[in-house]
Amino acid sequence: MKIIILGAGQVGGTLAEHLAREENDITVVDTDADRLRELHTRLDIRTVAGAGSYPMVLRQAGCEDADMLIAVTNTDEVNMIACQVAHTLFRTPTKIARVRATAYLTRKGLFAHEAVPIDVLISPEQVVTDHIRRLIEHPGALQVLEFTGGLVQLVAVKAYYGGPLVGQELGFLRRHMPSVDTRVAAIYRRNRPIIPRGDTVIEADDEVFFIAARRDIRAVMSELRRLERDFRRVVIVGGGNIGERLAEHLEHSHQVKIVEHNLERCTQLSERLDRTVVLHGSATSKRLLEEENIEDCDIFCALTNDDEVNIMSSMLAKRMGAKKVLTLINNAAYVDLVQGGEIDIAISPQQATIGSLLTHVRRGDIVNVHSLRRGAAEAIEAIAHGDTQSSKVVGRAIGDIDLPSGTTIGAVVRGKEVLIAHDDVVVESGDHVILFVIDKRRIRDVERLFQVGLTFF
């Protein structure tokens, strides 16, 4: 696939890295020649220096015969104009744009072929807000991913010493919980992936990814770790787009406080939010945290654009008694360094956004992609089509499907029915199949499984 990426920042660069590994023809456009040189040295891609919204630059990048344009520069207007130019002058089939400003996102009908012709709109702030919201709804989870409109969830938790399932084989799970159907999709032990089998033994400190119907998630979590009580008192640092959206979602069911250093922004937040307490000050101030009784806080969310402020305020809050801290970290290289110590959960907004973009690049009928483990693994939702002669999955029991190495099927969703992927479950045409792929090099093989052909014999 020939893809043009506008913007060589964190998202654009990471996306180029993902797609270049998958044998795509990638061209990256940016005004920063130094950044382009760095990418070109590392990756097998073309680069073009220039403004991504200029027709001549798009032509130079190969827009005349490109399959897809992905506009992820830091400027909404550049992204929108680039999609308009690509549509009007080059008839580019698929145009994806990152748009941050709520002023654009709330205008119905703005993004349509007869208006601003963007086929797929990505709002990083909304993606990250939804990600944090799910973590707050599931205390103790490291990740919570949704599939098929929320019917199925894939949850990552850390197994704890003394947990009912620690030291037990996975086959014990079904016998121990006969009324709850679940499947362990993957285990990470000391950062190394393990493909689970019935005789795999769960060890303390394993990071366990399990899949279940939404209604059964808490029951399964209770077997792997101590269930934490629901979060009620939430402190948000940073009143930007993410902080405001999260507060707006939580304020009617939680006690929410926002700490914001900009006085004008504080005034805006106090006018827009109904029940949220808005505090003017610095979250790195020990005095402010003491005055707000930070030791009573159930979860402290540091969501500013400044990694240093987020990390330092989180560490301070944790030392002063906050029960859980969640930290937004824009520099992806820092995520592994800080998570697991005083910072309970570190979130990379770039990594969260990448999955939304990859969903629209995958071959076959792939409707949902989540990038995991800093891009090393993926969770995929694919729709099975065809029949026993044209499909490699339809009409076959899961135990008989020739899955690529390192790939597991976690669940099959048929209409509103959730079928956990035991070996005797037979896939039907139209089923949504949830897969976990621990090795990104196998993604193409997974896509081929769900591509319908005249025959595959």
From Swiss-Prot:
GO cellular component annotations of the record: plasma membrane
Gene Ontology MF terms in the entry: potassium ion transmembrane transporter activity
Disruption phenotype: Deletion abolishes any K(+) uptake activity via TkrH and TkrI.
InterPro entries: K_uptake_TrkA, NAD(P)-bd_dom_sf, RCK_C, RCK_C_sf, RCK_N, Trk_Ktr_HKT_K-transport
SUPFAM superfamilies: NAD(P)-binding Rossmann-fold domains, TrkA C-terminal domain-like
Recorded topology in the membrane: Peripheral membrane protein
Domain RCK N-terminal, chain residue ranges per copy: 1-122, 231-347
Protein residues bound to NAD(+) 1: G7, A8, G9, Q10, V11, D30, T73, N74, R98
Primary residence: membrane
Signal peptide: none
Entry keyword DNA-binding: no
Residues annotated to bind NAD(+) 2: 233-261
Subcellular location: Cell inner membrane
This protein's UniProt keywords: Cell inner membrane, Cell membrane, Ion transport, Membrane, NAD, Potassium, Potassium transport, Repeat, Transport
UniProt-recorded name of the protein: Trk system potassium uptake protein TrkA
Upper taxonomic lineage: Bacteria, Pseudomonadati, Pseudomonadota, Gammaproteobacteria, Oceanospirillales
Gene of this entry: trkA
